[in-house]
């Protein structure tokens, strides 16, 4: 294990801000692609059950109508994507984009308790996530945690600016008092959300409906197709379920043992590399009614969120490699100027 840690430490993995840039870029991709499909009729129809049962978005239909609600969301998502992209250079824009991203994924995650047929009845209901609804939404837990991570990073960098604007000084101080700057908050949220995702998706693989839902993905996966010849229809799903639960346990153990966390993060990286490489090969991945690429159809829209989950896996891997090298695990990374916010000391 020591050799693995040293090997990873010598790799580009520990490049400063690599994880930050990957998470930011992944969220930009998500907002651009999902925003794009909101302009088409097929996506407006797909959104109906989500908006209708969303406690934070149900008002969109009375205000804008079916197509108007979809267009409104498209504008918002593109705006958030642009702000996050500008955040590579301008932390103020990045902070605003992160706030918009948090609101977006709070809106989607809160749909889950109210969505009809959110849990598969053939598998006994909860915690068997329905393949066509909850499975799509549950990944947003990780996207929400990633948004909190970016908000914290941008707030800390803004707080260290030489001349922050007064308005944003107040905003950053408010965020500091809210507990956003708590040590390892973002790290814990990202790790916890990944554990939840692996648990739920691993659970579905042990049931018939989950095995059937996997057929197009495994059949067209360049890194997964061998599972059917090796294990058969149900065996392939069970193999993946066991692997996903094993990954979840390693990631969960990473809260206390960074070396186990490294193994979990590596398994997570392998998982999402395997799923993302399906995208170029899966049939009907792009909506023909909207002209094809970049208008995502159901299977690609489901897989595309794994861009963020892969970036988060790399973040966790980097964090655990750093912690495995340092005896004082989880040393405070917060600048002094951020630590003084709660005391009300004026900075800048």
Sequence positions of predicted segments:
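Membrane-interface extramembranous regions
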Residues: 1-348
